[in-house]
C-alpha cells in the first residue's frame, strides 16, 4: 500500500485485522465507499463472498480480492501469486539441513492455497532428502502467536529440527531458536530480526509493483476484471536470500531451480486435494 501511494501519489487508507466475517468486512468497506474511495482491496480469503455481493451492489467501485477465485466481467477481480514456487525452493533448503529427518510445518487453515504450499515444500524436501518427513500441525488462525507457539513446541518435542510455517507471526521461529532448531520463515519481516539464530530463508511477497500496475490500469480505463496469478517471473513471489548455514551444493541447486522456474522450463507440481507421501497429517482435520 505504501509503495502504491509513493509511486502514484494517490490517497490510500487501510484497516487491519478485520475478522473473516461478511458483516464486519461490509461495515468497513461501506465506510470507505461513503468517504469516496472507489477501489477496495480485500486481502484475506474469508472476504470472498462479501466482496462478490458488494461488487454487484456498487458497480462504480472496483473490488479486488486477494487469494480468491470469484470474479465478474466488470468490477470484481482476484489476484494472487504462485507462492508454491518459492515454498518448493525453501523445501530444498530444509531437506538438506535436517539432521533428524523430521521437519515440522505450522499451518493456518486446510484450504487449497495452504495445502499446495505444504506439498510444494515437501516436494523440495523429498528431492534432496528422500528419508525426511514433513509433519503438519494446524492452528486454524492466520495470526495467533499463542497457538503458533504451541504447535511449534509440539512439533519440536517429537524431534523436529527444522520448522516451516504458513502463519503471520514469527512465533514459530522464536520457538525454533529457543530449541536450537532451524526455521523457514514466511515473509522477511518475520525473519532475521525475530529469530536470527534459527532463520534460514523465507518465501516472500512483493505486492507493490502489482498494485501500481492494476491501479494505473483503472486510472487509464484499461482495467480488466481477471484472475491474476503471478509467478516468480513477475517478481510477485520470490525466495529471500539464504543464510550461510545452507550447504553450498544445495544453494547451487536452489539457484538452478530458481532460473528454471523463472524461465518456465520447470514448475513444481500443484497438489491441493491431499498430502503427498512424505507429509504426515491430514487435509481434513
Spans of model-derived segments:
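A residue-level marker of the well-folded mature domains of exported/periplasmic proteins
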Residues: 1-285
Amino acid at each position: 500500500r505504501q509503495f502504491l501511494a509513493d509511486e502514484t501519489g494517490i490517497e490510500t487508507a487501510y484497516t487491519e485485522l478485520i475478522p473473516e466475517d461478511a458483516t464486519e468486512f461490509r461495515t468497513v468497506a461501506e465506510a470507505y465507499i461513503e468517504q469516496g474511495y472507489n477501489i477496495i482491496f480485500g486481502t484475506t480469503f474469508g472476504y470472498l463472498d462479501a466482496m462478490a455481493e458488494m461488487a454487484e451492489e456498487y458497480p462504480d467501485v472496483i473490488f479486488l480480492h486477494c487469494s480468491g477465485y470469484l470474479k465478474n466481467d466488470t468490477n470484481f477481480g482476484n489476484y494472487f501469486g504462485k507462492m508454491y514456487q518459492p515454498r518448493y525452493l525453501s523445501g530444498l533448503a530444509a531437506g538438506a539441513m535436517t539432521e533428524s529427518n523430521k521437519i515440522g510445518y505450522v499451518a493456518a487453515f486446510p484450504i487449497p492455497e495452504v495445502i499446495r504450499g505444504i506439498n510444494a515444500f515437501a516436494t523440495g524436501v523429498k528431492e534432496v532428502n528422500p528419508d525426511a518427513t514433513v509433519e503438519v500441525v494446524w492452528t486454524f488462525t492466520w495470526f495467533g502467536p499463542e497457538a503458533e507457539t504451541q504447535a511449534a513446541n509440539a512439533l519440536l518435542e517429537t524431534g523436529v529440527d527444522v520448522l516451516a510455517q504458513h502463519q503471520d507471526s514469527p512465533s514459530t521461529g522464536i520457538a525454533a531458536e529457543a530449541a536450537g532448531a532451524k526455521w523457514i520463515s514466511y515473509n522477511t519481516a518475520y525473519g532475521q530480526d525475530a529469530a536470527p539464530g534459527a532463520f534460514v530463508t523465507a518465501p516472500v511477497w512483493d505486492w507493490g509493483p502489482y498494485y501500481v500496475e492494476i491501479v494505473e490500469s483503472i486510472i487509464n480505463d484499461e482495467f480488466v476484471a481477471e484472475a491474476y496469478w503471478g509467478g516468480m517471473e513477475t517478481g510477485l513471489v520470490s525466495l529471500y536470500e539464504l543464510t550461510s548455514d545452507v550447504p553450498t551444493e544445495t544453494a547451487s541447486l536452489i539457484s538452478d531451480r530458481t532460473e528454471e522456474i523463472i524461465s518456465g522450463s520447470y514448475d513444481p507440481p500443484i497438489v491441493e486435494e491431499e498430502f503427498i507421501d512424505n507429509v504426515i497429517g491430514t487435509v481434513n482435520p
